[in-house]
A protein has these predicted regions:
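Second-shell loop/turn segments in exported
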Residues: 19-25, 121-131
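A structural "domain/chain start" motif
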Residues: 1-37, 42-52, 114, 135, ...
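Surface-exposed short loop/turn segments
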Residues: 42-45, 56-126, 136, 140
């Protein structure tokens, strides 16, 4: 361990475009780019393509929700909550080992992550802004998952 929380045995990571099981298109590209930027900015790992990498981080967006939290007297939404749920798998391409130590009832090799944010359209906050906030939070959570457990 280098003292930074990341494994010194890993030098490169491949992050292919996340899959998207929802009807909201384009979010998978935004999330993939955000994860790649987080890896470049916060870890000692270099991004590499496909089989040139030591490890591969894959993800699947399984749910995107926009829920109304409050309405005005005309039943217009005043406060909304936007959330995205993804499953992420990080594997060592040299050994086939899963690098995530978390176990999940859905699929043991996938780690579910969910994050959410609220926004208020009446005061000028948009769904695009809320989407970017959630994507940035998810990217941070995903890269946090890549740290070596104590």
């Amino acid at each position: 361990m280098l003292g930074n929380g990341y494994s010194p045995d890993i030098k490169t990571v491949s992050v292919p475009i996340f899959e998207n099981d929802t009807y909201r298109r384009g979010v998978e590209y935004q999330l993939t780019e955000a994860v790649q930027n987080e890896i470049k900015n916060r870890t000692p790992y270099r991004l590499a393509r496909g089989s040139d990498a030591d490890t591969r981080l894959t993800g699947r967006i399984v749910q995107i929700r926009k829920d109304v939290l409050g309405e005005n007297n005309d039943d217009d939404p005043r406060q909304l909550q936007y959330s995205i749920m993804v499953r992420v798998t990080w594997e060592n391409l040299r050994t086939g080992e899963l690098l995530s130590q978390k176990e999940v009832p859905i699929a043991p090799e996938a780690v579910p992550l969910i994050t959410q944010t609220g926004f208020a359209p009446e005061v000028g906050q948009s769904q695009a802004t809320a989407t970017q906030i959630v994507i940035d939070q998810l990217a941070r959570q995903i890269v946090n998952m890549m740290e070596v457990p104590w």
